């Protein structure tokens, strides 16, 4: 399960900001955990686990987002969890992103002042009013039995918008609107609960 936002037309830095870069920096500086070859893999910083990904004929870079393992039970029944070979929730970036960000990674390694780095990045790489952003979000399930593919399905969103009505903001806000409508029309009980834990909510969305 991967998601990322980036410029519709790639810039040299391979990234632009529509709000404070501090959140991106903190996420990169955070430990991560995921499943690889049936085992839990960990890293003290997410940017140490960058890998390549091809999607619809386009090459991207990806890295894990914090701890993926608690989400296994959201995707799979309990009896299948121990049989999972690879499982990762992560962030998508444009091809060449890690090369352009190498100096930033070195500063993160040195525990430099994140607020200062954030301010510098914002000044140099924020979206301008005439630019477009792009989001790519996808979930892929891939299964084999006796070395044969028995299931392979991908659901995705690939959207670009003018930054004043950005694809990122639309993705977040439209999801929130759908959730609110679901709560109102399905007479949900008061309290905190996950929106997709009840079949009537899933069907509605």
Model-derived features: positions:
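C-terminal catalytic/substrate-binding lobe primarily of soluble NAD(P)-dependent oxidoreductases
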Residues: 1-205
